[in-house]
């Protein structure tokens, strides 16, 4: 049985309470002092719970007072913080790459909530005392140990009581965006998703995250790798809490410290550094370590005010699923929020604007920030969903296999691992009538839990539809009657006419230019007249067919409708295009698009559909 602890934190009158004090977060001008005291919970009959085999408990509770009122903080260890194949890499003085697989599953990083507060959350490190933050009655409080020898004293304070290191707000370097207008976003938000789209959006998603610490940051922390690792772990724990609201789980799959020299030319030009890091990820990192997304943490001071930069709408892309972030603040949480902000760009989010709102003060995707922000705005959620439905990135749907999860298996982490029949979370969170949350075994006579071909704990009958056809180019999937799993998604053959002969099927979709224009520029947009596409025969402006080694290559006359896509609003005669300096494929006609009768785009050429597939 998992040990549960009740820790009573008694609020004490402290000589320095309310005065200024220097903490790890900086100079705090108002705080309260508390003394944590562990009191083990007792089983029925007064028997004390047995000590767990691990160093840190899976669940804990803390009771203390905030502003004179008692609160109970529930904590559960973030069991999925590290992937099963997590590695750490550093470099020897002679340049040799040294990679290890340290045991990190018995860690001290927790998520939690305040009892009886539905919207509360908490992120706590219990490695050496209690350090982190919790939300209580709409406000954010921080807790960290006081550096007093032989004392269990901790400080509790609000972020508003931390004196800023400087008055310059944190600014993201992203200036190019993918949105068109406020009206466009509002209209898009009013569109109704299909049931299949809703299922896709509601599906659990995973990001296998790789973090690189550059040599400048390494030297800033006096080459102390344990200190750097602890900071990074705290950052990922905070990011995980932020992204849980979007049904994303971020698993740290690797941490690399450039302990000898920088492996790229890290420079003050943030755009140049991002470009070089993206190339390094594609050419050097991915061949030796798989990951869905990577970020470079650097100690360099970027030119101007930006403290981070990322590609927009690029998750899963070998080069552009990347970001760079400056380690600009001693407050770890501020850097973590910047990391979450830049990852938000990778996931299709733009900067918030006037009508964008979230439950607490600042939102994660605000352009400027001097205070922490832990929630995404309504705009960010809509833009993120629109991006997911348009691009359907696949790497984030890869649910880890049971053999890839932490070994030995941990019951209660929502992953069905080796030896488990189901996993519906902790006993307090489990909503399943089919699964025993304590044992992670199916209830008596239950055949299944919550899979697509499971209904009331029994397999659905053979030929019951478990996944409807999404469109002309998809096929429905039917249950077998022998399994709870829905069969693998299959599609119509490539080249089959679709949408009343407007297009041809390609990998389960019907790519036509009209829909691509709407995805790029919003509702009410149409494809431009044919003469606009002749601009693709030239390399001036936005016309081109493809890029080769940074050089624009024009289209042949027969291929002009396989290059840049041109769209228009209403009866406009202007040839409009969409470009992104960081994504050469943005705004291009999609592969498989119809470019003439019996013709489709393949490798930027308009070819016969019969020979294309």
UniProtKB/Swiss-Prot annotation:
It comes from the Eukaryota. Residues 408-494 form the Disintegrin domain. It is found in: Secreted. Its EC number is 3.4.24.-. Expressed by the venom gland. Residues 560-574 are annotated as: Hypervariable region that may play important roles toward cell migration. One of its GO terms (molecular function) is toxin activity. CDD domains: ZnMc_adamalysin_II_like. Zn(2+) binds at residues 341, 345, 351. Pfam families: ADAM_CR (PF08516), Disintegrin (PF00200), Pep_M12B_propep (PF01562), Reprolysin (PF01421). Residues 205-400 form the Peptidase M12B domain. GO terms for cellular component: extracellular region; plasma membrane. GO terms for biological process: proteolysis. Ca(2+) 3 binds at residues 474-475, 477, 489-490. Negative results: does not show autolytic activity, as encountered in viperid venoms. Does not show activity on TNF-alpha (TNF). Monomer. This is Zinc metalloproteinase-disintegrin-like atragin.
């Amino acid at each position: 049985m998992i040990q549960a602890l009740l820790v009573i934190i008694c609020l004490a009158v402290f000589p320095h309470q309310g005065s200024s004090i220097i903490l790890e977060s900086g100079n705090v001008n108002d705080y309260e002092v508390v003394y944590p005291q562990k009191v083990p919970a007792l089983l029925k009959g007064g028997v004390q719970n047995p000590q767990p085999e691990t160093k840190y408990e899976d669940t804990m509770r803390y009771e203390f007072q905030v502003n004179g009122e008692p609160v109970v903080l529930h904590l559960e260890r973030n069991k999925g913080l590290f992937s099963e194949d997590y590695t750490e890499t550093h470099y020897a003085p002679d340049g040799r790459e040294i990679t290890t697989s340290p045991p990190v599953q018995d860690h001290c990083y927790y998520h939690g909530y305040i009892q009886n507060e539905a919207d509360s959350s908490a992120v706590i490190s219990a490695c050496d005392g209690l350090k982190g933050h919790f939300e209580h009655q709409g406000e954010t409080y921080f807790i960290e140990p006081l550096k007093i020898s032989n004392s269990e004293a901790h400080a509790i304070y609000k972020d508003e009581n931390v004196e800023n290191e400087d008055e310059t707000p944190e600014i993201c370097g992203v200036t190019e965006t993918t949105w068109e207008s406020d009206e466009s976003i509002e209209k898009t938000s009013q569109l109704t998703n299909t049931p299949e789209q809703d299922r896709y959006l509601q599906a659990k998603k995973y990001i296998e995250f790789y973090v690189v610490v550059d040599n400048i940051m390494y030297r800033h922390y006096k080459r102390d790798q344990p200190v750097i690792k602890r900071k990074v772990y705290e950052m990922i724990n905070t990011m995980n809490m932020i992204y849980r609201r979007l049904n994303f789980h971020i698993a740290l799959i690797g941490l690399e410290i450039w302990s000898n020299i920088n492996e790229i030319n890290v420079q003050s030009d943030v755009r140049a550094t991002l470009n070089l890091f993206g190339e390094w990820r594609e050419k050097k990192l991915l061949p030796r370590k798989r990951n869905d997304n990577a970020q470079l943490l650097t100690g360099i001071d970027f030119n101007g005010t930006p403290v981070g930069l990322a590609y927009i709408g690029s998750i899963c892309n070998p080069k552009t699923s990347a970001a760079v972030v400056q380690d600009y603040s001693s407050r770890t949480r501020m850097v973590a929020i910047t990391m979450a902000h830049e990852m938000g760009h990778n996931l299709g989010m733009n900067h918030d604007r006037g009508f964008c709102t979230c439950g607490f003060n600042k939102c994660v995707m605000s352009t400027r920030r001097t205070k922490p922000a832990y929630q995404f705005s309504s705009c960010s959620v809509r833009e993120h969903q629109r991006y997911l439905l348009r691009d359907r990135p696949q790497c984030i749907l890869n649910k880890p296999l049971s053999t890839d999860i932490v070994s030995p298996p941990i019951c209660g982490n929502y992953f069905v691992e080796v030896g488990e029949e189901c996993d519906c979370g902790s006993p307090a969170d489990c909503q399943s009538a089919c699964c025993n949350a304590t044992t992670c075994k199916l209830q008596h006579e239950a055949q299944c839990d919550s899979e697509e071909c499971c209904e009331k704990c029994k397999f659905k009958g053979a030929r019951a539809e478990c996944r409807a056809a999404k469109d002309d180019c998809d096929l429905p999937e039917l249950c077998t009657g022998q399994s709870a799993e829905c069969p693998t998604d299959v599609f119509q053959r490539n080249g089959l006419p679709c949408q009343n002969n407007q297009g041809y099927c390609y990998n389960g979709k019907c790519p036509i230019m009209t829909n691509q224009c709407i995805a790029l520029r919003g509702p009410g947009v149409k494809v431009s007249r044919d003469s606009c596409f002749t601009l693709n025969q030239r390399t001036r402006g936005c016309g081109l067919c493809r890029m080769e080694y940074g050089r624009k290559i024009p289209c042949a006359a027969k291929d002009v409708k396989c290059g840049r896509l041109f769209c228009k609003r209403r009866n406009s005669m202007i040839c409009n295009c969409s470009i992104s300096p960081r994504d050469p494929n943005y705004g291009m006609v999609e592969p498989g698009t119809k470019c003439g009768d019996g013709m489709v785009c393949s490798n930027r050429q308009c070819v016969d559909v019969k020979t294309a597939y």
